[in-house]
């Protein structure tokens, strides 16, 4: 993070978004929000149960970020009421990539790596590691279904570590033999594939909640001033900030 203070989450977000827009110079920015998904928890009640965050101040700041983006930035905010953010992003990527657009996902979530297996015109940038992600030379969903995903509370096949998964994912014959030795392995694998594979919901595009934001830099300045983000609204810094987002108008 960039700072500590009353609104560190808000500060980090708005301080971090400008260099990303400047770096990639997009024609359009989608700001995708989480819905109220159910189908994966119906498959596995433990799914993402380890991600509960009861920090009231964090959630208040998250709501502030969403409000500020909608009111002040020329971004397209998208949300489906019943879908995970990941699936909504995957759906938007599919739609645009199939239209011939180049898409860049800004995320540290490795679930998106599977999209690199599908779309040549999709790229992923990890803002934490500050690097582009290389396309896997194997089926990422198969590998992750074997290993599991601790971040989403998805247990892997017992005894299957990185080395075993690396061998199995590259050999259908070895994978078939591996499952024959213990049918429980295949049951865990198939469950995990259903939990990990991002779903194409392009048939639900009409159900997406979409907000086409309009830039309001005067209001944004006042908000940042009220939050005492003085380093962001100094004249030189502020002019650079505004000019970055003017490219999206």
Indicate where each model-derived feature is located:
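Domain-level signal for Mg2+-assisted phosphodiester chemistry and nucleotide/NA-binding surfaces
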Residues: 1-68
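Short, amphipathic C-terminal "tail helix"
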Residues: 238-249
